[in-house]
């Protein structure tokens, strides 16, 4: 018997961390919610990270997902910005782990491939495909749309992982 799994996708960022929640039952995906947690740019880094943690913790408590997926960060030429993004990503990994959720991580190209079929694409393509895959999905920001794409990617990958485990059990 298949069970419904609620997944939160998280797109980490220091200014805005997007979140998107979907339910997966077999091949079926259902939109549950999405949004953005923000931090005040006028505050010190530690306070901003606390704001992100508190915001994500509230979302996790409200929606009670079963699993989490977080996007890997990319390295850019600005080392300071990359470091700050890495710290925000640490919060994105920590909050669901503290809530007892298994946390998967996906490269941006893997997310794009799962949602639009190729590893390279424009954000607009991703947002459009999120709406195609889940017509009831709504998102106010690009970060929330990206988070939904991350959740969709995890839903697809977790099915592959489960199938591989079943196959392994049959062979053993």
From Swiss-Prot:
UniProt keyword terms in alphabetical order: Cytoplasm, DNA damage, DNA recombination, DNA repair, DNA-binding, Endonuclease, Hydrolase, Magnesium, Metal-binding, Nuclease
E.C. number: 3.1.21.10
Principal place of residence: cytoplasm
Binding site for Mg(2+) 1: 11, 143
GO molecular function: crossover junction DNA endonuclease activity; DNA binding; magnesium ion binding
Cofactors (names): Mg(2+)
Catalytic activity from the UniProt record: Endonucleolytic cleavage at a junction such as a reciprocal single-stranded crossover between two homologous DNA duplexes (Holliday junction)
Active-site residue list: 11, 71, 143
KW Phosphoprotein (keyword) present: no
One Pfam family of this chain: RuvC
Oligomeric and partner information: Homodimer which binds Holliday junction (HJ) DNA. The HJ becomes 2-fold symmetrical on binding to RuvC with unstacked arms; it has a different conformation from HJ DNA in complex with RuvA. In the full resolvosome a probable DNA-RuvA(4)-RuvB(12)-RuvC(2) complex forms which resolves the HJ.
Function as written in the Swiss-Prot or TrEMBL entry: The RuvA-RuvB-RuvC complex processes Holliday junction (HJ) DNA during genetic recombination and DNA repair. Endonuclease that resolves HJ intermediates. Cleaves cruciform DNA by making single-stranded nicks across the HJ at symmetrical positions within the homologous arms, yielding a 5'-phosphate and a 3'-hydroxyl group; requires a central core of homology in the junction. The consensus cleavage sequence is 5'-(A/T)TT(C/G)-3'. Cleavage occurs on the 3'-side of the TT dinucleotide at the point of strand exchange.
Family the entry assigns: Belongs to the RuvC family.
Protein's recorded name: Crossover junction endodeoxyribonuclease RuvC
Species in which this protein is naturally found: Brucella anthropi (strain ATCC 49188 / DSM 6882 / CCUG 24695 / JCM 21032 / LMG 3331 / NBRC 15819 / NCTC 12168 / Alc 37) (Ochrobactrum anthropi)
Gene: ruvC
């Amino acid at each position: 018997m298949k069970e419904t799994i609620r997944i939160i996708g998280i797109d980490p960022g220091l200014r805005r961390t997007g979140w998107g929640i979907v339910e997966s039952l077999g091949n079926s995906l259902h939109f549950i919610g999405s949004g953005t947690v923000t931090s005040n740019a006028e505050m010190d880094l530690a306070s901003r990270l606390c704001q992100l943690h508190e915001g994500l913790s509230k979302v996790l408590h409200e929606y009670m997902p079963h699993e989490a997926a977080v996007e890997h960060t990319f390295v850019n030429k600005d080392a300071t910005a990359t470091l700050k993004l890495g710290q925000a990503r640490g919060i994105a990994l920590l909050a669901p782990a503290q809530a007892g959720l298994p946390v998967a991580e996906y490269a941006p190209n893997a997310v794009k491939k799962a949602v639009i079929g190729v590893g390279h694409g424009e954000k607009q393509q991703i947002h459009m495909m999120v709406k195609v895959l889940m017509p009831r999905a709504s998102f106010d920001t690009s970060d929330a749309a990206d988070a939904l794409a991350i959740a969709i990617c995890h839903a697809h990958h977790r099915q592959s992982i489960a199938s591989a485990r079943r196959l392994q059990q049959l062979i053993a």
